[in-house]
Amino acid sequence: MARNSIKKSPVVKKKDTPIVRKRKPIQQEAEEDSNDEESEDELNVEGLIDASDDEDEEEEQEQEEQPQEEENNSDDDDDDDDDDDDNNSEADSEEELNQLLGEEEEEDPSDYNSDEFSDEPKDDDLSRINIKSLSVSDPSIQKNSISKFSDGSIRILKPEIEPKYDSDDSDAENFNTIGNIPISAYDEMPHIGYDINGKRIMRPAKGSALDQLLESIDLPEGWTGLLDQNTGTSLKLTDEELELIRKIQQQENTDENINPYEPLIDWFTKDEEIMPVTAVPEPKRRFVPSKHEAKRVMKIVKAIREGRIIPPNKVKQQLTEEEEEDQFNFDLWQDEIEISDHIMNLRAPKLPPPTNEESYNPPEEYLLTEEEKSKWLQESPIDRERNFLPQKYNSLRQVPGYQDSVRERFERSLDLYLAPRVRHNKLNIDPDSLIPDLPSPKDLRPFPIRCSTIYEGHTGKIRTISIDPQGLWLATGSDDGSVRIWEILTGRQVYKIQLINKEINNEDHIECLEWNPDSSCGILAVCVGENIYLIVPPIFGFDIENSGKLRIESGWGYDTFGNKKKDLKISSQKEEDNKESDNEDEDEEEDNDDDDDDDEPETSSTVEPKKEVAKWYPPNTEQASMGISAIIQCRKTIKKLSWHRKGDYFVTVSPDSKNTAVLIHQISKHLSQSPFKKSKGIIMDAKFHPFKPQLFVASQRQIKIYDLAQQVLLKKLMPGVRLLSTIDIHPRGDNLIAGSYDKRVLWHDLDLSATPYKTLRYHEKAVRSIKFHKGNLPLFASASDDGNIHIFHGTVYDDLMTNPLLVPLKKLNGHKIINQIGILDLIWHPKEPWLFSAGADGTARLWTT
């Protein structure tokens, strides 16, 4: 059948595929042989194949089965023929071959010039067939392209070589090129790095726990159990490394280039030789004394006789004689020879040189009088400032012997061997390096530098001053019992009220006064002894004065002490005493007034209303005509007063009032309450936070910060002083300054520790007042009994990592010191860099730029 196809086929053109047609019968014959062999062992697989296969696959199988059946039939027919038929077919094939050769010779030679036999390459189907492998090439493969250079010459552009397929090192191992980056950086990624071409090296698949167990049981050759950090796979040893380990275990030579069995060269023989190498007899000169040595000996003997050479025994004798002579021959006035001490040797301290009073003829001012002599003799020897009496003699020969010389030498000897010695190394420190690098005060202007106005009129010392929120009126309170209001710019007195009659009451003083921070009401609170006067001075005009009086008068309707608001104490008096004894050592706690309202009365032995900590009284006709709108009476003398920023609350401090030392008063309801059940220590000052619901309470040695909303203790500051005098809070609320009676100014950073950030010691006496500027200027000042005011620049940065900057600017003095009391109070102008001070000399001063 194959032969017939060859005979009938015409001349093959390039568009046909004759090669595939010729190979197809060969494949069919191979398939026929395989089918004959497999027919005997054929299995029945019906029912095992899924009936839902595609129809295309069934058609392909049917087409493949049809030629196979035809070939099988033809093969069966051929098998039935006889040997004679085979011989006839061979003869026929030879005749057909001869006919084909003849037809090829008769072909027209012009056919060789046709397109079929042209040498020019054409883009046809056969051009893509590899003759050796009979495979079709990929049309996407790029070939060389011809271009031209700028000069017109031919330029051949070759396709790019793909390193993965075309280069010779395609079988090289893909090394990871991530460098020193740890492989843990790729834990959350699907790849473990990049190869030399920048392509990702994917993470090898990890088997299950069962696979890992099987791998640990069947250990392959070179297994280490380690993980390769570059590839992420298990690290295996190479054959060379395994061979090296084997040689080390068997103590073999690891380097093949070294020969352990090199030939040994015996440089010395082991046999003892009897006969000498040379048998020359000894010369006579070795047995006769040398003439040359005799000459040298005679020269040495001659030099010894002449004294040019000294024998060793005489040298020692001469040295001893010279030392004996030099022992008493020395220069008395030559410099002292310094001998270096041992490293562990500490020299004895030298005696101090004598002073003028130890002279035998001292000046007259060094001699003691009779009273000083008697006082010196009465004192014990330990308490005496000097251990001798200065005496005067006309000449040195009249000076007697010092009777205490032996005793002093003995005491010094005791001190030298009994007292321990310490070597103190001197520190070579530049003094300029200890001074902090601060900006110049000229760059930090403006700040007050001079006194521009003096407010005179008080007959006693001015204890307190305050300026209204608008910065126009200055109020002063003095020991003469009067409160005066001054116009700041002119120094003119515009209002005066006499609150204390000194003829009747000499004990009370005006301790403090302060304007309400709300400028629309014009209320001035004045503390006189146990009373607080709320005054609206007639200096503002009708609108402001009427607003202030209405705000105070509206609170009389809310005064319900003893009627509506009661605190019902359920426990008996005996239980209350026990509770107070148990809480004696606890810190201060705030009283929760809201919880008291919710408590319902219960049947008990004692039901008492809440005690009044202060009483509110309306003024009489005479007091109302003076501008007084309300009077608050407390239990003890009030020393400090501070307003809340909204102007409805103010806090007062009575140091002698024990558990009611701190009181909070509310104008709108005429209520006074004590926030603490008891106080530990004497309360010196109290202030509200500038914008948070917090209360700062300063006792004698510590400062506590309370949260009024949550009623808890937030922080406790430990200034480390004996007696605090006053505190003030920075307008931002993150810093606090405190003054003490032991001459210290303390700066606390509330974001840091409880100890002070800076402790300033520049005052000579007690610090009475210290204040921050409430405007936008970073200034603060402190006043003391030494009569001086110190102005400081204090910048607080927004960056929490930067510490505040404190720079001293100016020292102001002008007040006189009366009875060791200097300046009592300070206040800053709310807008300008002006400072007001009140002194014990009865004057108030304005310090301006």
UniProtKB/Swiss-Prot annotation:
Where is it localised? Nucleus, Nucleolus; Nucleus, Nucleoplasm
- Key words, A-Z: Nucleus, Repeat, Ribosome biogenesis, rRNA processing, WD repeat
Entry GO MF terms: large ribosomal subunit rRNA binding; ribonucleoprotein complex binding
Which spans does this entry mark as compositional bias, Basic and acidic residues? 569-581
Report the main location listed first in the record.
Answer: nucleus
Q: Which InterPro entries match?
A: BOP1/Erb1, BOP1_N_dom, WD40/YVTN_repeat-like_dom_sf, WD40_repeat_CS, WD40_repeat_dom_sf, WD40_rpt
Check the UniProt entry and state the signal peptide residues, or none. Answer: none
Which region ranges are annotated with the description Required for interaction with YTM1?
405-441
An individual GO BP term = maturation of LSU-rRNA from tricistronic rRNA transcript (SSU-rRNA, 5.8S rRNA, LSU-rRNA)
- The ranges of region (Disordered) come to 1-130, 569-619
Concerning its family, UniProt says: Belongs to the WD repeat BOP1/ERB1 family.
Q: What does this protein do?
A: Component of the NOP7 complex, which is required for maturation of the 25S and 5.8S ribosomal RNAs and formation of the 60S ribosome.
Q: How does it assemble?
A: Component of the NOP7 complex, composed of ERB1, NOP7 and YTM1. The complex is held together by ERB1, which interacts with NOP7 via its N-terminal domain and with YTM1 via a high-affinity interaction between the seven-bladed beta-propeller domains of the 2 proteins. The NOP7 complex associates with the 66S pre-ribosome.
Please identify the protein, giving its name as recorded. Answer: Ribosome biogenesis protein ERB1
**UniProt source species:** Candida albicans (strain SC5314 / ATCC MYA-2876) (Yeast)
Underlying gene: ERB1
